[in-house]
Amino acid sequence: MKKRIVCFGDSNTWGYIPVTSERYDETIRWPARLQDKLGYTDYTVVEEGLTGRTTVFDDPFDPDLNGMKVMPAVLRTAAPIDVLVFMLGTNDFQSNIPAGNPISTARAVQYMLETARKLGLDRPGERMKILLISPIEITEDRLTFKENDVT
């Protein structure tokens, strides 16, 4: 049986192109590149990214971006899951997210990962592995994307 890897994240997973606000072709996005590297015989990589997705915080302009509200359903549709690749948190620091700060985002990520475990979506007899990819460090010189800046 194929191993299933679910990539749950934000614009980096979705394939957002910062300069043009368009989307990379699916063959260029990193989940597809991971699938190519692993091959198609033994692995299935599920791409579940959304531009602007937050951890547990509501965006007042688009409440559908709250990752916690959709994560359980998304993960259930992909079960069983061997590896969850999780990358959220960067969008928690947008100016329209009042609760966004490092401590609250870290707690939100912890809560989401604990919730993912409690859903019981592991393959029988195996425990789902979780790969946490942390958000980039946001400093004054990183507030805007530069040419060839890949994050």
Where are these regions (language model features)?
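Serine-esterase "nucleophile elbow" of acetyl-processing enzymes
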Residues: 1-50, 56-59, 73-76, 84
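Solvent-exposed loop/turn segments at secondary-structure junctions
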Residues: 12-14, 50-55, 90-94, 137-139
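Alpha-helical cap/lid subdomain in secreted, periplasmic
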Residues: 33, 40-41, 65-151
